[in-house]
């Protein structure tokens, strides 16, 4: 039996309004619990369009057929008009998710975090995280115990800033296994649960065809030597590719693969490490990546 952490990122208004209810229904039918990370502030994701001038981002958008994958409402959100606030407008959906799944913070403003947080000072970053946590806690009526940095944009500054909130764990980076990042003080910080597997948009049209993706991914899962964690997006697997996700769950069950919330992957003893800036094939720009203590 292979146990895989299932992380669901919710980046946009439509992903919350349309994708999350569909995913909740699918997961219920398959008796699966997951960790769902919500963006709760303004939906300004359309402002990423300026990145089309970067060849790597343009190629990603073309090979993944982004217009049909996400829809023009997502691709243009927050450009010609102010971005709609996601959280309180979809409070009932978020509360329903929290009844059955582990719920954490993805971002206050996903676009702002991904595009500008690397230039923020620590207090600005703390204030932004606090705003998102406060909003999510108001919605679900209970403390939030986990978070996942938007776009995996995390480095030592993010790790230090999140220590102020005493969360149970964060999932801010890519890597191989859960670990505790070393702080500037030399002490171990809040546990990190890295994503280990590629996302749909990172590999479609580059490493694998859409129709072959599920078999390709299951092969990666079964060969994973660490602690496998897979991320889906409400805007993708909850919308245009929900049928592919259902097929993945059915095939996974046949292969003895089970899915669980990320918190179930934690153990009392974790290795030490750091979150450093790195690159992942198929994704434009830098991401937080796990570095085991003592390695270079």
Swiss-Prot record:
It catalyses: 4-deoxy-4-formamido-alpha-L-arabinopyranosyl di-trans,octa-cis-undecaprenyl phosphate + H2O = 4-amino-4-deoxy-alpha-L-arabinopyranosyl di-trans,octa-cis-undecaprenyl phosphate + formate. GO terms for molecular function: hydrolase activity, acting on carbon-nitrogen (but not peptide) bonds, in linear amides. Pfam families: Polysacc_deac_1. Pathway: Glycolipid biosynthesis; 4-amino-4-deoxy-alpha-L-arabinose undecaprenyl phosphate biosynthesis; 4-amino-4-deoxy-alpha-L-arabinose undecaprenyl phosphate from UDP-4-deoxy-4-formamido-beta-L-arabinose and undecaprenyl phosphate: step 2/2; Bacterial outer membrane biogenesis; lipopolysaccharide biosynthesis. Its EC number is 3.5.1.n3. GO terms for cellular component: membrane. The keyword Hydrolase applies. HAMAP family: ArnD (MF_01870). Catalyzes the deformylation of 4-deoxy-4-formamido-L-arabinose-phosphoundecaprenol to 4-amino-4-deoxy-L-arabinose-phosphoundecaprenol. The modified arabinose is attached to lipid A and is required for resistance to polymyxin and cationic antimicrobial peptides. This is Probable 4-deoxy-4-formamido-L-arabinose-phosphoundecaprenol deformylase ArnD. It comes from Escherichia coli O139:H28 (strain E24377A / ETEC). The gene is arnD.
């Amino acid at each position: 039996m292979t146990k895989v952490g299932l992380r669901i990122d919710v980046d946009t208004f439509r992903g919350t309004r349309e994708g999350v209810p569909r995913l909740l229904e699918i997961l219920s039918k398959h008796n699966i619990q997951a960790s769902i990370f919500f963006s709760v502030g303004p939906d300004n994701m359309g402002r990423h369009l300026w990145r089309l001038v970067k060849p790597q981002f343009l190629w990603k958008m073309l090979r993944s057929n982004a217009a049909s994958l996400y829809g023009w409402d997502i691709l243009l959100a927050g450009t010609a008009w102010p971005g709609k606030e996601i959280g309180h407008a979809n409070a009932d959906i978020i509360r329903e998710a929290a009844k059955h799944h582990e719920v954490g913070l993805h971002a206050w403003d996903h676009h702002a975090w991904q595009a500008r947080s690397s230039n923020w000072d620590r207090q600005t970053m703390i204030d932004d995280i606090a705003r998102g946590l406060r909003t999510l806690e108001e919605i679900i009526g209970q403390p939030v115990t986990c978070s996942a940095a938007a776009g995996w944009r995390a480095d030592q500054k993010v790790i230090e800033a999140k220590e102020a909130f005493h969360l149970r764990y964060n999932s801010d980076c890519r890597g191989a296994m859960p670990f505790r990042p070393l702080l500037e003080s030399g002490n171990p910080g809040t546990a990190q649960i890295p994503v280990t597997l590629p996302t749909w948009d990172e590999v479609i049209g580059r490493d694998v065809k859409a129709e072959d993706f599920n078999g390709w991914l299951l092969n990666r899962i079964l060969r994973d030597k660490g602690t496998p964690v897979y991320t889906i997006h409400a805007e993708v697997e909850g919308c245009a590719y929900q049928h592919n996700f259902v097929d993945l769950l059915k095939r996974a069950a046949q292969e003895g693969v089970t899915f669980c919330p990320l918190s179930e992957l934690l153990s009392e003893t974790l290795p030490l490490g750091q979150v450093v800036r790195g690159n992942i094939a198929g994704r434009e720009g830098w991401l937080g990546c796990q570095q085991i203590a003592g390695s270079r």
